From Swiss-Prot:
Positions that bind heme: 100, 123
Example GO molecular function: heme binding
Region Disordered, annotated ranges: 1-25
GO terms under cellular component: chloroplast; chloroplast membrane
Main location: plastid
Domain notes: The cytochrome b5 heme-binding domain acts as the direct electron donor to the active site of the desaturase, and does not require an external cytochrome.
Protein name from the UniProt record: Acyl-lipid (7-3)-desaturase, chloroplastic
Gene Ontology terms: biological process: long-chain fatty acid biosynthetic process; unsaturated fatty acid biosynthetic process
Family per similarity comment: Belongs to the fatty acid desaturase type 1 family.
PROSITE patterns reported in the protein's UniProt record: CYTOCHROME_B5_1 (PS00191), CYTOCHROME_B5_2 (PS50255)
Cofactor section: Fe(2+)
Motif Histidine box-1: where in chain: 227-231
Function: Fatty acid desaturase that introduces a cis double bond at the 4-position in 16-carbon polyunsaturated fatty acids that contain a Delta(7) double bond, resulting in the production of 16 carbon fatty acid (7Z,10Z,13Z)-hexadeca-7,10,13-trienoate.
């Protein structure tokens, strides 16, 4: 796939198989905003005339004007930089890549895109982090208008109020020393200990039961330590976070692809029908949203989805290899992924295949191995599918009728209140026990507001979030138990499967897909 196709809006949308006729026509030949188009035309005649000026704001070096414009993803004068955009200003991240406290892998997510939302949602003290930007080189005359703009969490009054209270009441200043990224060490030992014990049992006697027990371990890894590690929230040490994140690869996923489709797409644009890959990645088999086209069989999806969920892990396998070859996962292009990160995917897949298939087949024969592997795959897939899906697919988070959530999602992605969006499009269930076993994913609202905080702090944070929402009359969705929200999820899937398709009011915003 060539570079143009990788970044085309058609590829971005049809990868989820959800393009409508109107949208497909608007995306077939994506057009930049007016300023971007003028810049691109001017670049044709000046590309070889001058190089862009890099300004070090720390010393306030004078900027020499150069002809602006060009394609920042293809023109050589821009591609030689590890550029990102923050609040309308383009920076070169190159001198900071190996000095970022959170590690290079997280910073790589910002390369080649407007990273405002990533930046502001990941730092509990944004004023401190923003001061670091002032030390980075600014790319003068960079075609910022050509880069799809990002939401701006710091413009959310709700988010700012919650974050300030979390700093004062939960961490009381200790976040300066990284307290918000610690506290889950005990959970990590429990998860890894269980997984290791079940693998020993699996290799001792590979069969569907031991495979299923190991599958629970694989699911527990996926819900907890890999999730928290890839968010940079398991430790203040990026090496520890990376190692925890790589357990995703051992369990059958890909930490690299997860970081891009989960953090760049889902977390920033939760329940956006165009930009959140979780909304459309299962289509056309499953219709998670009434803004997607309706097929006759969707009315039965609440029944047949249980026959599809066991194969989730196999879908991951196919998708990860495809993404490696195309440089794009569902919802995001891998602009900043390093060669080493790509190599971890290959090494991780080979290790997973050896541990799940190769060694048991050698010890017990192919028949025993196949039975055990089936137990693993089906159990892990069902647990992950059920626990992931309930968080954003209930009437409160995707209402079929008008209300505050629908109104929020009908706004432009860059103008809607980001903090309010995270609250309205997520639902919680359970409490401390659920938090331990799901890595905080049961407290999905708090996780979406603070993805870089260790999940062990979410129960305390949830009290603050609920209180701030109550003061403002913002709905805060919480179910008492997993069976309760799971039952409501099943009913919602029946309702949305039968609901007529609703028109989308933001067709013009599909242009954003051309560069995501």
């Amino acid at each position: 796939m060539n570079a143009t196709m990788q970044r085309s809006a058609v590829a971005g949308r049809t990868s989820g198989k959800v393009a409508t006729t109107a949208r497909a026509s608007s995306m077939a030949r994506p057009r930049l905003p007016i300023a971007g188009r003028v810049a691109r035309r001017s670049a044709v005649t000046v590309r070889a005339v001058a190089e862009p000026v890099v300004v070090d704001k720390a010393v306030e070096a004078p900027a020499k004007p150069v002809p602006s414009g060009g394609d920042p993803w293809e023109d050589e004068k821009w591609t030689k930089y590890k550029w990102t955009v923050y609040r309308g200003v383009a920076y070169d991240l190159t001198p900071y890549l190996d000095r970022h406290p959170g590690g290079r892998w997280l910073l790589n997510l910002a390369i080649g895109r407007d990273a405002t939302a990533l930046f502001e949602s990941y730092h509990l003290r944004p004023e401190v982090a923003a001061s670091m930007l002032k030390r980075l080189p600014v790319l003068a005359d960079f075609p910022v208008d050509a880069v799809p703009p990002s939401p701006r969490p710091n413009d959310s009054e709700l988010y700012n109020a919650i974050r300030e209270r979390v700093r004062k009441e939960v961490f009381k200043g200790t976040e300066i020393k990284g307290a918000h990224r610690s506290g889950s060490e005990g959970a990590a030992f429990a998860v890894l200990g269980y997984a290791a014990a079940m693998y020993a049992l699996y290799t001792y006697d590979a069969n569907p039961l031991t495979g299923a027990l190991l599958g629970l371990g694989g699911a527990w890894i996926g819900l907890t330590i890999q999730h928290c590690g890839n968010h940079g929230a398991m430790s203040t040490n990026p090496v520890v976070n990376n190692l925890m994140g790589l357990t995703n690869d051992l369990a059958g996923g890909s930490s690299l692809m997860w970081r891009y489709h989960h953090q760049v797409s889902h977390h920033i644009h939760c329940n956006d029908d165009a930009l959140d890959e979780d909304v459309f990645s299962a289509f056309p088999m499953l219709r998670f949203d009434d803004r997607l086209p309706k097929a006759w069989y969707h009315q039965f999806q609440h029944v047949y989805m249980w026959a599809l969920f066991p194969f989730l892990q196999l879908v991951f396998q196919i998708g990860d290899w495809q993404a490696l070859l195309t440089n794009r996962t569902v919802g995001a292009t891998l602009y900043g992924a390093s060669n080493f990160e790509r190599q971890t995917l290959i090494a991780g897949k080979l290790a997973h295949y050896f541990l799940l298939y190769g060694l048991p087949a050698f010890l017990h024969g192919p028949t025993a191995m196949l039975g055990g592997a089936a137990g693993y795959l089906f159990t892990q897939s069902i647990v992950l599918a059920a626990t992931f899906a309930v968080s954003h697919n209930v009437p409160e988070t995707k209402p079929l009728d008008p209300g505050p959530t629908r109104e929020n999602l009908d706004e432009s992605a860059v103008t809607r209140d980001w903090g309010v969006q995270q609250v309205l499009t997520s639902a919680n269930w359970g409490g401390v026990i659920g938090n331990f076993f799901t890595g905080g994913l049961n407290l999905q609202i708090e996780h979406h507001l603070f993805p870089a905080i260790s999940f062990m702090h979410y129960p305390a944070i949830s009290k603050i979030v609920a209180d701030e929402c109550k003061q403002r009359g913002i709905p805060y969705s919480h179910y008492d138990t997993l069976p309760e929200i799971l039952g409501r999820f099943v009913r919602y899937m029946k309702e949305v499967g039968a609901a007529p398709q609703k028109p989308v009011k933001r067709d013009g915003e599909m242009l954003m897909l051309s560069k995501f």
